[in-house]
Amino acid sequence: MTQGKLSVANKAPGTEGQQQANGEKKETPAVPSAPPSYEEATSGEGLKAGAFPPAPSAVPLHPSWAYVDPNSSSSYESGFPTGDHEFFTTFSWDDQKVRRVFIRKVYTILLIQLLVTLGVVALFTFCDPVKDYVQANPGWYWASYAVFFATYLTLACCSGPRRHFPWNLILLTIFTLSMAYLTGMLSSYYNTTSVLLCLSITALVCLSVTVFSFQTKFDFTSCQGVLFVLLMTLFFSGLILAILLPFQYVPWLHAVYAVLGAGVFTLFLAFDTQLLMGSRRHSLSPEEYIFGALNIYLDIIYIFTFFLQLFGTNRE
């Protein structure tokens, strides 16, 4: 009887398997042996093979597509996922080549847009016959505004035309020409010195904000709520200004509105710049180069127009 009561540790390696195969059931000891320590369980020293199950592997036993490395995914920055957005992505920005190509493409398109707009502004500012014509025919202004609004809604809200060549470039070209006409006509009402001054200030501000956005560790993409509140403040201030300004109730309200608008769109420029970078709470998909160029272009144009309202001097 004594010999029949073997401890679990003294069993032969094949004994338990033979008992299970024969359908026999053997009583376990009344007092089980103490479990091994962590070092014993992981090292395997002092234990017979088969006494305890093997230690789990270090890699999770999930399929590779179900595992997301938080260090390689921009959507896991700040400790929580960002959700599924149409414009945003969980694309890994570790591939520096893809990132550089995307940013280069956005800024190439942006440079062409700004050069076209600068040419139209210069034409409407320095060429007196053109300036007189556009001021005498305001219908072209409203037609350009309608084209601008329609193309902007199409590019901003419809991912199909925005992502497919050549429709995205055609729509962006029409959008840029209409916005350039609006900006040029607005500039024609100011003297040349004011326009050049505002162009210089806009260039310095935009360059400084862009460099700062690339260098700083502060995440502007996590401040969407603050930017939305500021944008709504700017919107309702514009409505109040449109009502009060014709009656000259508050003469300085226009300057306050211009300062607020320039500040809000400067923050939006930092926000849209960091969307291109990755390594932030939100980032644009590499397919959204048209959307990225569109946003930054609008930010720069709005900053310029608000500076014109703030520093510009009307033509006599």
Curated annotation (Swiss-Prot):
User: What segment(s) does the record annotate as region Disordered?
Assistant: 1-46
User: A Pfam family this protein belongs to?
Assistant: Bax1-I
Its BP terms in the Gene Ontology are: apoptotic signaling pathway; cerebellar granular layer development; cerebellar Purkinje cell differentiation; cerebellar Purkinje cell layer development; cerebellum development; negative regulation of extrinsic apoptotic signaling pathway via death domain receptors; negative regulation of neuron apoptotic process; regulation of neuron apoptotic process
Q: Chief location of this protein?
A: membrane
**An example Gene Ontology molecular-function term:** calcium channel activity
Sites where a glycan is attached: N191
Has keyword Zinc? no
Q: Which domain of life is it from?
A: Eukaryota
Q: Where in the cell is it found?
A: Cell membrane; Membrane raft; Postsynaptic cell membrane
Membrane topology per the entry is: Multi-pass membrane protein
Question: Per its UniProt record, what CDD domains does this chain match?
Answer: LFG_like
Entry keyword set: Apoptosis, Cell membrane, Glycoprotein, Membrane, Postsynaptic cell membrane, Synapse, Transmembrane, Transmembrane helix
Q: Which residues cross the membrane?
A: 106-126, 138-158, 165-185, 194-214, 225-245, 251-271, 290-310
Entry GO CC:
endoplasmic reticulum; Golgi apparatus; membrane; membrane raft; postsynaptic membrane
Q: What does this protein do?
A: Antiapoptotic protein which protects cells uniquely from Fas-induced apoptosis. Regulates Fas-mediated apoptosis in neurons by interfering with caspase-8 activation. Plays a role in cerebellar development by affecting cerebellar size, internal granular layer (IGL) thickness, and Purkinje cell (PC) development.
Give the quaternary structure. Interacts with FAS/TNFRSF6 and BAX.
Record family assignment:
Belongs to the BI1 family. LFG subfamily.
PANTHER family reported for this sequence? BAX INHIBITOR-RELATED (PTHR23291), PROTEIN LIFEGUARD 2 (PTHR23291:SF18)
What this protein is called in its record is Protein lifeguard 2
What organism does this protein naturally occur in?
Answer: Bos taurus
Q: Which gene encodes it?
A: FAIM2
